[in-house]
């Protein structure tokens, strides 16, 4: 199988792999979405019959938005844009989850034209602090390209009021949620017309940023029955085809898995699933190519995957900032414990490297070079 890698620069992490047969660069999909799409279209026209895997929210969104212009040249094994957008919209997703009986955090919605800040604060205060403030969309398309919308925290009503006033001209609604303290759980599925082809699950041990984000140390686990059932019901509601990650948090108070979001694309810790025996990219390729699929009957539980440089960032943040500055929960491990666990990970035989491979070291050295250059 010949693999080509596209990126915003001539060289990229994946393109440095020995398994990349070709590489090309395209204009930024964030700043110039139309030029990005045209570049992909030109490449697709020269490589008809290929299977196309966009890897980020923005590239998936842009290609699905104009999918009809590509469908005669390449196969894009994802749901249509409408379903992808509906699943990515957290406000819409939570409404659907409620109808399906899927547990969710207590939430108040603040519309983008809502000026009743006093009413929102009063309602949110009934939930109790601290609160999580997040936009309904993680990436927002504007006339000038895409922007990223981040998650923030409010420890009291005054902090919440300040955040709402700062977001008075927001372009998308906000979700104001109770903060769920507990480990992050990911359910990863490949489906074909709503039917599960393959599955995997992990828990996040450490994240970047430490308050919650990208998993930098994750462990493969048996899929919890409640979380798997919830993820399946949600994706079947969308009649999903392709891969998806459904993210939950295990609420320590009631031991229920509370829905966070759906990512209708490949995820950052994908290598852990592959190392554990579920090769989602190859399975999706087989599905797209119409080949017979032999789904894995199970996977290795207990393997851990570590993104070394992301874990180093986690350590630096914990050492440089206080728990309050990082918005950490009360039971967050001490700095000493974090340092000890970081060091012990180098000799833990259950931990696999997410990027580094002796047989294919190019991606790691590329990433390390860029990491060091950013520090200098």
Say what each PLM segment does:
Residues 1-79, 113-119, 342-345, 350-374:
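ATP-binding N-terminal substructure of ATP-dependent carboxylate-amine bond-forming enzymes
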Residues 206-209, 214-216, 263-277:
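Glycine-rich phosphate/pyrophosphate-binding beta-alpha loops
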Residues 175, 241-246, 294-300:
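Flexible, glycine/charged-enriched surface loops at secondary-structure junctions
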Residues 154-210, 219-232, 249-258:
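Phosphate-binding site of ATP-dependent enzymes
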Residues 286-376:
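Peripheral (often C-terminal) accessory segments that flank ATP-dependent C-N-forming ligase machineries
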Residues 84-174, 193-195, 225, 229:
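Active-site nucleotide/adenylate-binding loops and adjacent lid/helix of ATP-dependent enzymes
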Residues 157, 268-287:
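Gly/Ser/Thr-rich active-site loops/lids in small-molecule metabolic enzymes
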Residues 236-271:
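Conserved metal-phosphate-binding beta-hairpin within the catalytic cores
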């Amino acid at each position: 199988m010949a693999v080509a890698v596209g990126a915003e620069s001539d060289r990229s992490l994946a393109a440095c792999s020995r398994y990349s047969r070709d590489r090309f660069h395209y204009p930024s999909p964030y700043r110039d979405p139309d030029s990005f799409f045209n570049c992909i279209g030109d490449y697709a026209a020269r490589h008809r019959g290929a299977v196309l895997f966009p890897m980020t929210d923005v590239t998936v969104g842009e290609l699905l938005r104009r999918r009809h212009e590509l469908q005669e040249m390449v196969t894009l094994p994802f749901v249509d844009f409408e379903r992808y957008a509906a699943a990515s919209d957290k406000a819409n997703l939570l409404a659907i989850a409620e109808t399906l009986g899927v547990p969710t955090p207590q939430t108040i919605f603040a519309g983008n034209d809502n000026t009743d800040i006093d009413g929102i604060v009063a309602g949110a205060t009934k939930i109790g602090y601290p609160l999580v403030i997040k936009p309904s969309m993680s990436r927002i398309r504007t006339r000038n390209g895409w922007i990223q919308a981040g998650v923030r925290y409010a420890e009291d009503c005054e902090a919440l009021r300040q955040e709402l006033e700062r977001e008075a001209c927001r372009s998308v609604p906000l979700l104001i949620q109770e903060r769920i303290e507990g480990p992050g759980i990911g359910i990863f599925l490949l489906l074909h017309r709503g039917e599960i082809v393959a599955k995997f699950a992990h828990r996040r041990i450490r994240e970047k940023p430490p308050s919650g984000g990208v998993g930098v140390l994750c462990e493969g686990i048996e899929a919890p029955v409640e979380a798997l059932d919830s993820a399946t019901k949600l994706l079947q509601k969308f009649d999903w085809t392709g891969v998806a990650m459904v993210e939950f948090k295990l609420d320590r108070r009631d031991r229920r898995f509370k829905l966070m979001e759906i990512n209708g694309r490949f995820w950052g810790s994908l290598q852990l699933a592959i190392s554990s025996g579920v090769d989602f990219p190859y399975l999706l390729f087989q599905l797209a190519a119409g080949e017979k699929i032999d789904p894995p009957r199970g996977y290795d539980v207990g393997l851990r995957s570590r993104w070394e440089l992301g874990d180093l960032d986690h350590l630096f943040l914990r050492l440089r900032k206080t728990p309050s500055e990082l918005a950490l929960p009360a039971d967050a491990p001490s700095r000493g414990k974090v340092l000890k666990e970081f060091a012990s990970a180098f000799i833990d035989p259950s931990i696999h490297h997410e990027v580094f491979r002796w047989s294919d070291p190019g991606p790691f050295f590329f990433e390390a070079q860029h990491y060091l250059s950013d520090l200098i």
